[in-house]
């Protein structure tokens, strides 16, 4: 991940457990910031969205599923929470493109999107993946590894381009391009 304090800690000590402690402190600070800065009525929904990120990414179809938050959840009920997290820079949204044309934003389906964590290291902490598993691999990590790498690419692209993530899939959902 790109969190300066965590990177500095690893560069000095080379102890993943200390880095994970810092990452968990950062995550806890974000949750406290929800209570300080977010509209009071949105805080429970912010927490639901925030806590769901690893599970949303773990699924084969990584499109954000509101029903994964709550069986009766609807997009309009969670839009403010998602916008708040996005505007705070805590999540990255990647919108489905209905056809690959320019400009991409003209063909974006704003109701169909994927959500990524702002930082790959923090995603590992959110998912409670042992740093040793990340470094050395493990058979249990194979399935989530694709989502983890996809999040890394999203984070890197936003760092290079400043934002505007988009993906494409055909109508039959037999082909997909993760990033355009």
State where each predicted segment sits:
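Amphipathic alpha-helical segments of the small helical/lid subdomains adjacent to P-loop NTPase cores
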Residues: 1-3
